[in-house]
Regions:
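Metal-dependent phosphodiesterase/phospholipase catalytic core, i.e.
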Residues: 1-90, 94-98, 111-123, 133-142, ...
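C-terminal active-site rim and adjoining tail of enzyme catalytic domains
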Residues: 93-94, 101-210
Length: 210
């Protein structure tokens, strides 16, 4: 991120502070895609999923954002727990199958520790089917792994498709052509430019300062 500007004294805001900022903007159409960060392979470093999700949902409910959030995670345990505690909140199932990170572990004995007991090999490698069976509404895949055929598979199952993390405008164009429902990017201004060029609907901008 060579073009970002450092700000002395800047710190990571709490979720509660972010929600307050959004409310101050006055734009009630702003939604949040909140990702939980747990590692089932290192349980000693994290809260137990039920406690983690309970704490997260408490803030969301207290601030009145229950209908304005989606919860996503590579650790499907937290998504299953969200579905138990707050079935009205959409869950987005993150997946990646790369040498540097693989949360599905296709072809390995037993289920991946990341997928809450679901084994991709029991679905013949069909990721959308496993996400649907797990109760997800959204499949969020690493964008190089997405194809038009996979988008159709997911849509036929009633799932929405989001991809991450797309920073190249040509790739954004290609994924839109495939029919994805959402794109996660580090550069929303680039994506906004692509959407504007294509004549697609754009959300209203509502700048607000902390």
């Amino acid at each position: 991120f060579s073009d970002q500007t450092a700000v002395d004294g800047a710190r990571i805001p709490t979720l509660e502070e972010v929600l307050h900022l959004i409310r101050r903007s006055g734009n009630e159409n702003v939604r949040l895609n909140i990702e939980t960060k747990l590692r089932p392979t290192e349980p000693e470093l994290f809260l137990e999923p039920r406690e983690f999700v309970s704490s997260l949902l408490k803030i969301i409910h207290q601030q009145g954002f229950s209908v304005r959030v989606t919860i996503q995670s590579f650790d499907w345990r937290t998504l299953q727990e969200t579905q138990r505690q707050a079935p009205n909140i959409p869950t987005s199932y993150l997946t990646v199958q790369q040498d540097w990170y693989d949360n599905l572990l296709m072809g390995k004995p037993g289920p991946s520790p990341w997928t809450a007991g679901h084994d991709i090999d029991n679905y013949a490698g069909n990721v959308p089917e496993m996400v649907k069976k797990a109760g997800g509404q959204i499949w969020s895949a690493f964008h190089p792994e997405m194809t038009a055929e996979k988008v159709k598979q997911a849509h036929d199952l009633g799932l929405k498709v989001k991809v991450w993390t797309v920073n190249d405008t040509d790739r954004m164009e290609a994924l839109i052509d495939m029919g994805v429902d959402g794109i996660i990017t580090d550069y929303p201004d680039r994506l906004r430019g692509v959407l504007e060029k294509r004549g697609m609907p754009l959300p209203k901008q509502t700048p607000v300062s902390p």
